[in-house]
Amino acid sequence: MISKLSVSPTFSPSYNIIVDSVLDFSHILEYVTNKQVLIVTNTTVAKLYLTKFLAALVDDLDVNTCILEDGEQYKSQQSLDKILSTLLENNFTRNSTVLVALGGGVIGDITGFAAAIYQRGVDFIQIPTTLLSQVDSSVGGKTAINHQLGKNMIGAFYQPKVVYTSIEFYKTLPQREYIAGMAEVVKYAFISKDFYLWLDSNRDKILAKDSVTLIEMVKRSCQIKAQVVAMDEKELTGARAILNFGHTFGHAIEKCQNYRGLKHGEAVGVGMAQAIDFSHYLGLISQQQAKDFKDFIVSFGISIDFPKDICQKEFLEAMLLDKKNSNKELKFILIENIGSLSLQKQSKNELEQFLDISR
């Protein structure tokens, strides 16, 4: 069973997302024919899927691999340099090069960024192997590496030629990674009321990992993101900002833990709960709404407990570095109802007072 949808960004060429019930790498062959191919993956995914992927490629392809360490802390300048050095040392040229990101969000982000800057832009393909990367980071063209002062601070908007994935990847995906991915899925439920109702009615099948339901879940999640990206590919109008619901708080959590604590999806889950509580604090939603929204998050196995090892001063400093901020104004994605999110400016004092009473 295959589900296919198209992404039509504001400025970039359209491309397909292919969601497969089985794992068939032959779907990307048309995109690598007569190309120099660099497969970028990590140590974990390489052990599981690299041999199978290489076997699917035709014999006359010029193929190299670049295997990085596994973890958010390796979404770094050092890892980027390793990719670029591999390209240069093997004489990859602009018109014949295609990079293949075989892995989760970290691999997709750093490979996409390498593709964006190598010789001013070469082709790349996304093969996301985690639920989170399938529904979020592989779609929409955001590519980046982290800096010691903030997450995703060095990057570019750069779209892939195609996204191919399969729910068969879940067979080797740790449960913690699966639940972390569900946080991004649940985020889309707060953006779309129809999807909220669909998730609510299909919760048991999702938690049981029913194949047909999971394909539909991934497809619907990608459709929501694709619709937003079509309106505001490069965050010029503010429409795309709603995709960052939970991320202002979540990124600050990751930064405070030096990217070695909560996984990105886990931090987003906590971040959504924080954004919901902040919305209640500001009078945008009732106490009952806040409870219902947080209960919905938890019902998918997602923890919303704020890490106890983070001090408020450090957390506030991390939030001040958020990319959405401008002219010293703090910007948050807040919620007024299911399907009603908005980008709002708040003062530093308002945030400090909220943090004081919420700890």
UniProtKB/Swiss-Prot annotation:
Keywords per UniProt: Amino-acid biosynthesis, Aromatic amino acid biosynthesis, Cobalt, Cytoplasm, Lyase, Metal-binding, NAD, Nucleotide-binding, Zinc
Recorded E.C. number(s)?
Answer: 4.2.3.4
Q: Which InterPro entries match?
A: Dehydroquinate_synthase, DHQ_synth_AroB, DHQ_synth_fam, DHQS/DOIS_N, DHQS_C
- GO BP field: amino acid biosynthetic process; aromatic amino acid family biosynthetic process; chorismate biosynthetic process
* NCBIfam families hit by this protein: aroB (TIGR01357)
Q: What family name appears in the similarity comment?
A: Belongs to the sugar phosphate cyclases superfamily. Dehydroquinate synthase family.
Q: What does this protein do?
A: Catalyzes the conversion of 3-deoxy-D-arabino-heptulosonate 7-phosphate (DAHP) to dehydroquinate (DHQ).
PANTHER family, from UniProt?
Answer: 3-DEHYDROQUINATE SYNTHASE (PTHR43622), 3-DEHYDROQUINATE SYNTHASE, CHLOROPLASTIC (PTHR43622:SF7)
Name of the protein described by the UniProt record = 3-dehydroquinate synthase
Q: Which organism is it from?
A: Francisella tularensis subsp. novicida (strain U112)
What's the gene? aroB
